[in-house]
Amino acid sequence: MIFASRAFVCLAWIFWIMIIDNFAIGKDNASMSVIEKPEYNPTFGSTYQRVKARGKVICGTNPDFLGFSVLRGEAAGFDVDICRTVAAAVFGDSKAIEFIATNGKTRFEFLRDGTIDILSAATTYTFTRNVIKKLEFLPTTYYDGQGFIVRKTLGVSSAKQLEGAKICFSSTGTGAKNIADFFTKHEINYIPIPVPPDKNAKNIYLAGDCDMYGTDRSGLASNRLSFADPERHMILPEIISKEPLGPVVKYGDQKWSDVVRWTIYVLFIAEEMGINSHHLNLMPTFVK
């Protein structure tokens, strides 16, 4: 709940940023009155108005991601706290939030059709998703990389020792290409087992249908904690990709993307300044 706690502390910073921005805009407008204004027609969507009218933010999350979206069956962790922070920025109440479970198939569909307002589910920022699929990625909040998990009984200490292994991975993420590139580079044969989003790759691995499971290392660590016998599994040392993870909103919805983007930036500023819930009562009144 670190992010959610910081949200209330940071609302003052959002307020002052808006004042400074408005002051700057006023100065710009005054100077522009003597020259021709340039063409500038940003597309403003309706998400912000819809959220305000509804009275809550709807956030899409990964329901199985311990430490990021769930703890003891409750919505808790890094990703969901980002959504709570946005709710605090918009309504002054981090509880003005609803969480909807998404997977690799539904997450972008829900964003486009308005089922969710923001996707915060360990989603990798890629060129294709941003430019081709038209999704608005916000500041990266977690830098990750893809790795592998195996059973210790396999007797290996490196992915390079897995000649001919069966490897499970999600069919909808960035994993397939990362795995293909890695094993091609090292001239290792393997048997790919792509798993559709409605069948969790973790479960296929636990059922014994593959020797190794590949995904982001944060996901591997989270999944391992959920295993009945986590000590029998190990995450291999290889990091085979760069995975910048962060929230996503609908493309072209300028006002809403600005709200979410600058809420995240304010969290970064608070982190740098050492502002957190532990010394909130010691902060000056205007910051509270």
Task: Name the predicted role of every residue range.
Residues 58-67, 75-90, 124-126, 144-196, ...:
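Bilobed "Venus flytrap"/periplasmic-binding protein-like clamshell domains
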Residues 84, 88, 92, 96-161, ...:
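Acidic, polar ligand-binding/catalytic clefts
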Residues 49, 80-88, 109, 113, ...:
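Solvent-exposed, polar/charged alpha-helical surfaces in well-ordered, non-transmembrane soluble domains
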Residues 32-121:
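Extracytoplasmic small-molecule ligand-binding "clamshell" domains
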